[in-house]
From Swiss-Prot:
Pathway: Cofactor biosynthesis; thiamine diphosphate biosynthesis. Zn(2+) binds at H389, H453. It is an enzyme of class 4 (lyase). [4Fe-4S] cluster binds at C535, C538, C543. One of its GO terms (biological process) is thiamine biosynthetic process. This is Phosphomethylpyrimidine synthase. Keywords: 4Fe-4S, Iron, Iron-sulfur, Lyase, Metal-binding, S-adenosyl-L-methionine, Thiamine biosynthesis, Zinc. The gene is thiC. Binds 1 [4Fe-4S] cluster per subunit. The cluster is coordinated with 3 cysteines and an exchangeable S-adenosyl-L-methionine.
Amino acid sequence: MNQENASCPKKHFFGPASSRITVKGTIYPIEVGMRRVALTRSYECKGERFDAMPLYDTSGPFGDAEREHDVRKGLEPVRDRWGFDRGTVESVGGELSMTGRKPRVAKAGEAVTQMHFARKGIVTPEMEYVAIRENQALEAWIEKCGGKPVTPEMVRSEVARGRAIIPANINHPEIEPMIIGRNFRVKINANIGNSALGSSIDEEVEKAVWSCRWGADTVMDLSTGKNIHQTREWILRNSPVPIGTVPLYQALEKVGGKAEELSWEVYRDTLVEQAEQGVDYFTIHSGILAATLPDAEARQTGIVSRGGSIMARWCRAHKQENFLFTRFDDICDILRSYDVAISLGDALRPGSIGDANDAAQFGELKTLGELTLRAWKRDVQVMIEGPGHVPLHMIRENMEMQLKHCHEAPFYTLGPLVTDVAAGYDHVNSAIGGTLIASLGCSMLCYVTPKEHLGLPNRDDVREGVIVHRVAAHAADIAKGSATAWLRDELMSKARYAFAWEDQFSLALDPLKTRQIHAQNIAATGDTSATAKYCTMCGPDFCSMKRSQETTAAGL
């Protein structure tokens, strides 16, 4: 492993005003990581003065320039220090390859899921952690704006109801817990993973770390090439965010890539293998049924889900029902033993706007709702995956149908992409649809990169995809009435009007790019960020804000 490729902390990565801070819990000995931005002046908002802004931070130790980190050793197992006695866990099997820790599993017949404890009325350390994290140390501000801060009890209630999930496998002690649900901050997921045509373990670990640093709340390893197990191990041991996978991909590799040779036994063993490593959620395509295949195969673009196409091939070859459906209860029994959440895959999502909202898509959605209830009976956490390609005016129906059929389980969508002609710019295309559906209640957006439909993304593509979808999620949070999201914009506006460039850089979603663009343009004028009372878009003589200030100062 090349340590230099691991995105190790660099001084002032987020800017000189940014630092990593922690907030202590009151129920458990937890320390919740956040980022604090010091401002160059004090700004007034609703009668309150702010000389700093605490920010939600997904970067973990990688965002702390004061700490050294060696990816060859992995992150510290912070959850192991919280002292929560699950009481029903035992160690099994051999040692994990990087850490020497033995995998843990619930004793026979027991459950260790967040939903299980929530339904018993127990607030776990993870629940307290996400409550503190969602508030961003701004409880007083939230109340001043007429809102209610998130409490551990509220988190417990939402998880017990199934309206939110905390993906946190008991074998992934390195993560900083987060929550996915419509009553919380909108989250984003970044997909990484090798293919048969390229990428290495080093590159995928770096992309995972890079995703966390720029704002991805979860990461999915969708590797389909060589060294799937080893790649996943390196990613898990170095990930402060939950990791998801599609176990079907590795199961397919085990049978030489031949879908017809897949079996429940191969798939079951793959689930256990990945659960023991620490994967936090699985995408499982249990909703594609033999009866729905004719509708899907008659579409303009057929079945565009990789997992969906694999299981369709298996069903056709064996003339049997999808074993991910028929063995669903067995799947849940495995997952409840490790607290792996299920992301019910949309195997029949539309791959073109002409196929949006058709019988195949919504037929599968109804099946996913039925499976949700079956998973909940076993205290397994569930979220529902959604489309896909959907024109803007048809997006609202997707959210309404999901709420109707899936019992308010969190919705997790790929976009939606609102047009089919944006190749090279599909990250923007996805963010347009994502902003709308998130404002309507979607809990998490899966990012799309500029390489979508074209090729395997590199590190720079990952950054671009994460930031663009972070913009979409933030815009949706504002539309939903988030007081913390609104405050960040309020402070940015005041900094902009005051020509406080350093504060603008610090408050931006991409401080590095913001600073670079301004520095490149202002250098030609002879001014600096410290002195310029204008930007090069308008220049010193045509700056509207500068003129407005001069007019006000003159009493005109």
